[in-house]
């Protein structure tokens, strides 16, 4: 039988509204903005085709395979409320299209090519449903929430962190000194900034040594286990692994990686190393806003968060709801739950398009960081709950008396909020009063309250629900 050459409409092959999705399919929800004159069915089918088996014309080699078995299918389309030309197109991909245990391959297939497609004005991947059969091919986070608590011996409260500033320009010795003061004052963690790798003013090995010295000294003085996120991100995977190995030899509890700039392949390798060697892995999302900030084009952060849980990381930055960085409350809590919980029900009011079962993949601790200070502590404790890291960079180091008093102020504020919550008080309503009461017993907290009493970062969130 000859084949019929020529171009035919995508929707004839790839738009299948009668299709019943399988438990093993990867499901995607795309926000599609077609070019004027392109019907939504054709646009949705084009997305399904270009991200699976299709190309722009019929090819004779189609006859050598079973398209029905391997093609992506656009199985449902709904208009976006309040928009005239946007649609949510649901696409189902057969599992055989993807390499096991490879986030890299999953993204190359689903978002690799189709975003430059001419028939679309814009395209955004809003959510993915990863089937359990595929999840079981991933190791996921090196340790997860419970193992981390056991390693640190810290229970019943959020953990406190601080990014060392100025992020660039300090010598290794002064950097270590700043780390020591923060940890000595009562923080659980300090953090390398995401762009601290190994620059001329501070090479990585020197930084690792001085930070290790700082955290052992703080540990001995406070009797608490301390950590510093040593950034192992590097220009090559081999160099990254070398840094991770050195961190393990120093006996530190945690290292760090920039997973988007470093790449999923590097990140997954590092996560495997961390599990095999007992290191916790802190993940920074540098570059995420390039991908996720536009409402009608790109990839929503909840998808990047799911991908990170599969690739592997014990902490990930996830917005604050109250600080200087983007994040609306319901949406942020939607992907915070995606990171922590075993099972998440579909809930469109929180931007969750699919029910997701993580089976036995460990959870990831969300990190709230960016423009937060002691007055935010009640809100953060209430919004994020115990399984979170609250990270105050300027909110620690900007204290008028220095780093250690800044750390004391944050720890006192946190302990006051946790105690008030445990006594049944309403943190949302009484937050300011709780902080004021605590500041009577802590001059460090009183000074912090005074400095930041007027600060607000009030802008309308870009990332809103429809």
UniProtKB/Swiss-Prot annotation:
Substrate binds at residues 113, 163, 167, 285, 317, 369. The disulfide bond which can form in the large chain dimeric partners within the hexadecamer appears to be associated with oxidative stress and protein turnover. One of its GO terms (cellular component) is chloroplast. Keywords: Calvin cycle, Carbon dioxide fixation, Chloroplast, Disulfide bond, Lyase, Magnesium, Metal-binding, Methylation, Monooxygenase, Oxidoreductase, Photorespiration, Photosynthesis, Plastid. It catalyses: 2 (2R)-3-phosphoglycerate + 2 H(+) = D-ribulose 1,5-bisphosphate + CO2 + H2O; D-ribulose 1,5-bisphosphate + O2 = 2-phosphoglycolate + (2R)-3-phosphoglycerate + 2 H(+). The modification N6,N6,N6-trimethyllysine is found at residue 4. Mg(2+) binds at residues 191, 193-194. It is an enzyme of class 4 (lyase). Binds 1 Mg(2+) ion per subunit. RuBisCO catalyzes two reactions: the carboxylation of D-ribulose 1,5-bisphosphate, the primary event in carbon dioxide fixation, as well as the oxidative fragmentation of the pentose substrate in the photorespiration process. Both reactions occur simultaneously and in competition at the same active site. Its EC number is 4.1.1.39. SUPFAM superfamilies: RuBisCo, C-terminal domain, RuBisCO, large subunit, small (N-terminal) domain. This is Ribulose bisphosphate carboxylase large chain. The modification N6-carboxylysine is found at residue 191. Pfam families: RuBisCO_large, RuBisCO_large_N. One of its GO terms (molecular function) is monooxygenase activity. Belongs to the RuBisCO large chain family. Type I subfamily. It is found in: Plastid, Chloroplast. The record marks 324 as: Transition state stabilizer. The basic functional RuBisCO is composed of a large chain homodimer in a 'head-to-tail' conformation. In form I RuBisCO this homodimer is arranged in a barrel-like tetramer with the small subunits forming a tetrameric 'cap' on each end of the 'barrel'. GO terms for biological process: photorespiration; reductive pentose-phosphate cycle. Heterohexadecamer of 8 large chains and 8 small chains; disulfide-linked. The disulfide link is formed within the large subunit homodimers. The active site is at 165 (proton acceptor), 284 (proton acceptor). Its cofactor is Mg(2+).
